[in-house]
């Protein structure tokens, strides 16, 4: 698909989209880990349907978190590149930098991958607690 005839717009589109996608993954990871600690993860997931109606927030959260665990190292580097692109646009890359940190962090928890969200969150928490 051709986005534009202008040089660099396709790359800028891809990187700006990555900020959004990887950012949602980072937010879900952090939110679900905290929610699991408090025992409210299902309540939080159910409440998200009011904002963004998806057929299965549990499956979406599991999928997005697992992608970060599986590909965190590569995604962190992509987010550092995105941060540079955001900065070149004159925007402080506060979120892009934070997303890169969360993706780096996620890469260290790859062993927690599971087809079950609760099991995956518990495995991450156990690994985190033992460090």
Range-by-range predicted roles:
Residues 8-12:
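Disorder-to-helix initiation segments
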């Amino acid at each position: 698909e051709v986005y534009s005839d202008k040089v660099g717009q396709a790359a800028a589109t891809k990187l700006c989209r990555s900020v959004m996608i990887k950012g949602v993954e980072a937010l879900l990871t952090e939110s679900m880990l905290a929610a699991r600690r408090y025992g409210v993860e299902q309540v939080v997931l159910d409440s998200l349907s009011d904002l963004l109606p998806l057929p299965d927030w549990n499956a979406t959260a599991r999928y997005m978190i697992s992608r970060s665990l599986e590909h965190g190292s590569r995604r962190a580097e992509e987010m550092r590149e995105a941060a540079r692109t955001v900065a070149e646009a004159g925007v402080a890359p506060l979120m892009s930098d934070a997303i890169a940190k969360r993706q780096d962090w996620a890469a260290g928890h790859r062993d927690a991958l599971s087809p079950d969200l609760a099991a995956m969150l518990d495995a991450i928490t156990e690994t985190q607690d033992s460090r």
